[in-house]
Each structure stands twice: as structure tokens, then as C-alpha cells.
Amino acid sequence: MREIISIHIGQAGIQVGNACWELYCLEHGINQDGTMPSDTTVGVAHDAFNTFFSETGAGKHVPRAIFVDLEPTVIDEVRTGAYRQLFHPEQLISGKEDAANNFARGHYTVGKEIVDLCLDRVRKLADNCTGLQGFLVFNAVGGGTGSGLGSLLLERLSVDYGKKSKLGFTIYPSPQVSTAVVEPYNSVLSTHSLLEHTDVAVLLDNEAIYDICRRSLDIERPTYTNLNRLISQIISSLTTSLRFDGAINVDVTEFQTNLVPYPRIHFMLSSYAPVISAEKAYHEQLSVPEITNAVFEPSSMMAKCDPRHGKYMACCLMYRGDVVPKDVNAAVATIKTKRTVQFVDWCPTGFKCGINYQPPSVVPGGDLAKVQRAVCMISNNTAVAEVFSRIDHKFDLMYAKRAFVHWYVGEGMEEGEFSEAREDLAALEKDYEEVGAEGADDEGDEGDDY
């Protein structure tokens, strides 16, 4: 079996996690208490969904996941929520005091006390796997727990499970909407370790997803639940081929191979189509070319950056539902002829496609319409650098005055770490610039950087 362990860190990670597991359970017909009426082979772990769920002898299906937070309120909601019987109590780990939006608390003081317990739980989950494939890590880098404890856990996972792939779903601060003043500090410090310790990181940002909800679903005031359900569709599409059998399966390590041209250039944009409300879907059925064009639209991107400002290095298209390879090839051929979607000159083909016949599921009473076919795109585009330069700019404004730095130093950080992380990000921006530059032949002498 090729199992995947999901790790949800901090409030954002946990709430996205709730949406994801809710959707997985719906897709597999697993009840809220973990029973699965359709599973006839009780205790036999060869079903495809066992990549994400382990089965007990009594026929209960338990998610291979842990939820970690430094303060209890968010995890208590899981403990008392609709899916409380789904998770093993040991999988829900909460501390007593908050990271207070402070990377240093999450990484050094408060996080240090809880990280061994987390790794112990991960070890238990890993021992339960026959062929662990990798980890999905969910966190936000604006707060303290997601950024600090997230980085710490990733660093420790690299030590314990060096060869396993780690995919991050990371919520980055939005350009306009901010939930904390020190977001730029936390993001820069955290990205410093994401660079080192994740194999692929998918960037999400709330503002972009708010806009998609407003525009495509006509929700005037989207809540986090609306956002998370949209995010969970993307994550579900990414992992469909691990959980169901399909025509062209896409493995987690395949994402890495196909999307990451250089180890550091691994920050991805994602988009999903069709995002339509039930009222609209009732009157229109979208074809493969239509949804394929939709995922390349700048307005469908789940992070605030414009792919037209950059070039694509690679992209993965995961189709699900009523889709045949012939349609996909035709749609991709059309995209290639379009001048709007530009690829770097050293990577002319750039498309990886997966098809899965399991149609997309939707949460009953949710906002998304039930559709026959959907597509999710994960793309590596040089425009992602916009996200970093925006955060770096805000970081510089504050750091020039050393504003708020004492809170970090007081928790045992050194000021040098700020400048080190900032330099690393400056180098990353430069890397993206070089990768997108015309003509790859003149860069032969700079191969040592990677």
C-alpha cells in the first residue's frame, strides 16, 4: 500500500483539515463514526482508500492524520464536532498556551515542548503503514503555530523520514486582508524552512479564494467554511488517484518529478474548475475544453498573483469524472496554441495530465454544484515570485525599524535569523527571475547554486 499521512498544524491547518476529511468521508461513503457500509472486506487493507484511512479489526476506518495546535479551542471543536468519533483521541494534540502569532514561540519555546509528542504520534501512524509514501502538511505561515511549529515539525520529519516526500498546503498572507501585524515576519521565517524541507508547496491565499467565492458562487460574505470547502476540492483532486483507481493515475512523487525543475523552485499555484453554484449548474453543463480554459484564467488562481506576468515551467492537470483522454489531448493542444499561456523556452511540453473516473463529490448543503466533470491544475509559474516580493517588501518596512523584533528575541531567537531568512528569500526571488529569463544556455556556469 502507498499510505499518506496528513498533518494539520495550527488553526488554519485544522480547519482546512476538517473540510478535507468531511469530503473524503463523503467520497468513500464512510459514516461520521468511521463505519463504512459498502466495505465488504472488513479488515482487509488492500482497498484503494486505505492510503488515507486505516482499518481496525472491528471495521472502523480511521484517518491517517494528526491535528496539532498550541492552544485547545480549535481542536476542542473537532473533539466535540460531527466527526468526533472518526478520529482516535491520540490524533488530536493540543497544548495549553497559544503561540500568540509569534514564530519564535511556535518554533522555540512553546512548540519545542509539544513537538516530540507529535513525532511520537506520527511514528505510531507510520508504523501502521506498509509502504509510507509521504506526508501532506497543512498550515498557514502568517500565524505563530502554523509558521513556527510547522517549520519545526517539517525539520524534524526531514531528519526522521528523509526520503519520504512532503507536500505542503500553505496559506500565505493576502495582499489586502491581514489577520496579524507580524504576518510578514512569520511568513519570511517560515518560508526559509519550507524552502529547505518541503518537496512541493502549494500556495493558497484567502483573499484570492474569497474573490472566487464572491464571483463564481455569488456568496456575498464568504466564511472560512466556504473557503475551506473550495480548498478541500483541490486537495481531494490531487489525491483522487491515490484513493480511487483511474485511467491515468498520478502518484505523489510524480508531482515532484514533473513540477520541480530545481529543488528550490517548488512553490506551486493551484486552480480548480468548474466553481459554479447549484442554480447555475442546473442550466449549463461544462465541457472539457471549457473547464480546461477556466483553470488557466488568472482569476481562478488560488493565490493572488497573475500567471500572465510569468511563464509556466510545468503544470499538472488532474481531471475527474466523465472525461476521456481524447478530449484532454484536444483541450491541451488548444491551450498550447494560445499565446496567453506562455512556457519557458527550455520546457516546451510542460503538461502532465491525470484522469480519474470518480466524479467530484460535494458536501450536501454546501455552495458548490454537483458536476459531471472537474479539473484541478497545479502549476509551476515564475509569477509566484510576486507573492514573495510582496511579503518581503512588508518585511523590509518593519524590519528597517526593528519593529516588534523584541518579541521574537525574547523567545530565544537571534536577530541574525531574520536577516538570514530574508537573504534566503531574496535569493529565491532571484532564482525565479533567472529561471524565467530568456535563453537557458548562458546559465551553464551558475549550476552550482542548486
UniProtKB/Swiss-Prot annotation:
Sequence positions that bind Mg(2+): E71
Biological role stated in the UniProt entry: Tubulin is the major constituent of microtubules, a cylinder consisting of laterally associated linear protofilaments composed of alpha- and beta-tubulin heterodimers. Microtubules grow by the addition of GTP-tubulin dimers to the microtubule end, where a stabilizing cap forms. Below the cap, tubulin dimers are in GDP-bound state, owing to GTPase activity of alpha-tubulin.
Protein name (database record): Tubulin alpha-1 chain
MF-aspect GO terms: GTP binding; hydrolase activity; metal ion binding; structural constituent of cytoskeleton
Keyword Nucleotide-binding tagged: yes
Catalytic EC class: hydrolase
Swiss-Prot/TrEMBL site (Involved in polymerization) positions: Y450
BP terms from Gene Ontology: microtubule-based process
Organism from which the protein derives: Hordeum vulgare (Barley)
Record-listed E.C. numbers: 3.6.5.-
UniProt modification remark: Undergoes a tyrosination/detyrosination cycle, the cyclic removal and re-addition of a C-terminal tyrosine residue by the enzymes tubulin tyrosine carboxypeptidase (TTCP) and tubulin tyrosine ligase (TTL), respectively.
Catalytic function, reaction form: GTP + H2O = GDP + phosphate + H(+)
Keywords: Cytoplasm, Cytoskeleton, GTP-binding, Hydrolase, Magnesium, Metal-binding, Microtubule, Nucleotide-binding
The keyword Membrane appears for this protein: no
Pfam family, any one: Tubulin_C
Main localization of the protein described in the UniProt heading: cytoplasm
Description of how the protein assembles with itself and partners: Dimer of alpha and beta chains. A typical microtubule is a hollow water-filled tube with an outer diameter of 25 nm and an inner diameter of 15 nM. Alpha-beta heterodimers associate head-to-tail to form protofilaments running lengthwise along the microtubule wall with the beta-tubulin subunit facing the microtubule plus end conferring a structural polarity. Microtubules usually have 13 protofilaments but different protofilament numbers can be found in some organisms and specialized cells.
Family: Belongs to the tubulin family.
Cofactor section: Mg(2+)
InterPro entries linked: Alpha_tubulin, Beta-tubulin_BS, Tub_FtsZ_C, Tubulin, Tubulin/FtsZ-like_C, Tubulin/FtsZ_2-layer-sand-dom, Tubulin/FtsZ_GTPase_sf, Tubulin_C
Cellular component, GO, one term: microtubule
Protein location: Cytoplasm, Cytoskeleton
Binding site for GTP: Q11, E71, G144, T145, T179, N206, N228
Signal peptide residues on this chain, from the entry's feature table: none
